[in-house]
């Protein structure tokens, strides 16, 4: 079978707290692990999408509206919907599988993810990824 869930692939989460949110695959575990004996992957996604910026907004307000909140999570393949989009953002060094073991590691990983996603948003690339799903 062809593996189409590869790193940097944009996905939509279908179940749980972040259902309907967009995420990007960081690392895949096709054969599972000892703790999770099923196919799953580590994803980093957008918890809170940036708001729409208009021309008359001040610089301060524009900066506030351009903020992104991120999340990092291990997700079962059954709870993902893959999309045709890929996101060329480098999260491999910031988000590693053992990040979820301790709180302080997770906080630093979230800050790194947030920074790289905000930078991607401000350059105007991958516009689809930063728009809220309307459903």
Curated annotation (Swiss-Prot):
Name of the protein: Large ribosomal subunit protein eL27
Q: What taxonomic lineage is listed for the species of origin?
A: Eukaryota, Viridiplantae, Streptophyta, Embryophyta, Tracheophyta
PANTHER family referenced in this protein's UniProt entry, alphabetically: 60S RIBOSOMAL PROTEIN L27 (PTHR10497)
The entry's cellular-component GO terms read:
ribonucleoprotein complex; ribosome
Organism from which the protein derives: Pisum sativum
Which SUPFAM superfamilies does this chain map to? Translation proteins SH3-like domain
Keyword Ribonucleoprotein (UniProt): yes
Question: Its family?
Answer: Belongs to the eukaryotic ribosomal protein eL27 family.
Instruction: Set out the biological process GO terms recorded for this chain's protein.
Output: translation
Task: Output the Gene3D superfamilies linked to this UniProt entry.
Answer: 2.30.30.770
* Keyword annotations: Ribonucleoprotein, Ribosomal protein
The molecular function terms of the Gene Ontology recorded here are: structural constituent of ribosome
């Amino acid at each position: 079978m062809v593996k189409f869930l590869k790193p940097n692939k944009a996905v939509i989460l279908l179940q749980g707290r972040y259902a309907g949110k967009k995420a990007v695959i960081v690392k895949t575990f096709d054969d599972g692990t000892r703790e999770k004996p099923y196919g799953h992957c580590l994803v980093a996604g957008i918890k809170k999408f940036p708001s729409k910026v208009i021309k008359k907004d001040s610089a301060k307000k524009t900066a506030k509206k351009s903020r992104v909140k991120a999340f990092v999570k291990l997700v079962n393949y059954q709870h993902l919907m893959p999309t045709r989009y890929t996101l060329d953002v480098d999260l491999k060094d910031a988000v590693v599988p053992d990040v979820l073991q301790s709180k302080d590691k997770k906080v630093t990983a979230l800050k790194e993810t947030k920074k790289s996603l905000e930078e991607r948003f401000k350059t105007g690339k991958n516009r689809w990824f930063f728009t809220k799903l309307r459903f």
